[in-house]
From Swiss-Prot:
Its EC number is 2.1.1.228. Homodimer. Signal peptide: none annotated. Gene3D superfamilies: 3.40.1280.10, tRNA(m1g37)methyltransferase, domain 2. It catalyses: guanosine(37) in tRNA + S-adenosyl-L-methionine = N(1)-methylguanosine(37) in tRNA + S-adenosyl-L-homocysteine + H(+). GO terms for molecular function: tRNA (guanine(37)-N1)-methyltransferase activity. It is found in: Cytoplasm. It is an enzyme of class 2 (transferase). One of its GO terms (cellular component) is cytosol. Keywords: Cytoplasm, Methyltransferase, S-adenosyl-L-methionine, Transferase, tRNA processing. It comes from Nitrobacter winogradskyi (strain ATCC 25391 / DSM 10237 / CIP 104748 / NCIMB 11846 / Nb-255). This is tRNA (guanine-N(1)-)-methyltransferase. The gene is trmD. Specifically methylates guanosine-37 in various tRNAs. InterPro entries: Alpha/beta_knot_MTases, tRNA_m1G_MeTrfase_C_sf, tRNA_m1G_MeTrfase_TrmD, tRNA_m1G_MTases_N, tRNA_MeTrfase_TRMD/TRM10.
Length: 239
């Protein structure tokens, strides 16, 4: 079964966007994955194609209606077990491990929020899993959905040149990725570390590991702390 991303949006013209170029675009053209874009307004029932209304209890902005989204979700042709996601700044953070889970499945249905948000009743009624790509607010969920889809597509079989490419990247082992270098050997007085040119694969691997650990401790102490919790040091015993 081909991995398929189904996207519900008020702006279908935004897609495929960046998903139509580079790795994701080539894989899409090669039918290694599929993209199904659905206009939420097609599920509206009035002549104005209304999809939102004012917030109950008052307040600024508009809220996407539960009944319209329910029709859009129910009309989507998603395989059994497909995750139902809502891109939302209040959702659980998207992690590389979650991306790997999504890439291993049939592909998600993704609701792209707009305005002030989505009626909570559709989230509860359809069991939408709210996903966030960061602690900031975008104009809508489309860009966030593209980021999620791109992260998943890269992990699909046949998309990247080498299977191990995805295994050495940032977050794959709870660490940020080590520094990368290529020719020329010297650039503005800065040279490639000698160990990377030594041909000693064990030493290269050790250097990369040490650099990844140092970067993670410096830039993402939260990741380092979580890693330490998940992988506590082994206790030495006398014997």
């Amino acid at each position: 079964m081909t991995w398929r991303a189904t996207v519900l949006t008020l702006f279908p013209e935004m897609f495929p966007g960046p998903l139509g170029i580079s790795l994701a675009g080539k894989a899409l053209a090669a039918r290694l994955w599929a993209l199904d874009i659905r206009d939420i307004r097609n599920s509206a029932t009035d002549r104005h194609r209304s999809v939102d209304d004012t917030p109950a209890g008052g307040g600024p902005g508009m809220v996407l209606r539960a009944d319209v989204l329910a029709r859009a979700i129910d009309a989507a042709e998603t395989p059994p077990g497909a995750p139902l996601l809502l891109m939302s700044p209040r959702g659980r953070p998207l992690t590389q491990s979650r991306v790997a889970e999504l890439a291993a499945g049939p592909g998600p249905l993704i609701v792209c929020g707009r305005f002030e948000g989505v009626d909570q009743r559709i989230i509860d009624a359809r069991g939408l899993d709210e996903i966030s790509i960061g602690d900031y607010v975008l104009s809508g969920g489309e860009i966030a959905a593209m980021a999620l889809i791109d992260a998943c597509v890269r992990l699909l079989p046949g998309v990247m040149g080498k299977a191990e490419s995805g295994e050495d990247e940032s977050f794959s082992h709870g660490l940020l990725e080590y520094p990368q270098y290529t020719r020329p050997q010297e650039f503005e007085g800065r040279v490639i570390p000698d160990i990377l040119l030594s041909g000693d694969h064990a030493k290269v691997a050790g250097w990369r590991r040490a650099e990844a650990e140092a970067l993670t401790q410096e830039r993402r102490p939260d990741l380092w702390a979580a890693r330490a919790t998940q992988n506590p040091p082994e206790r030495k015993t006398n014997g």
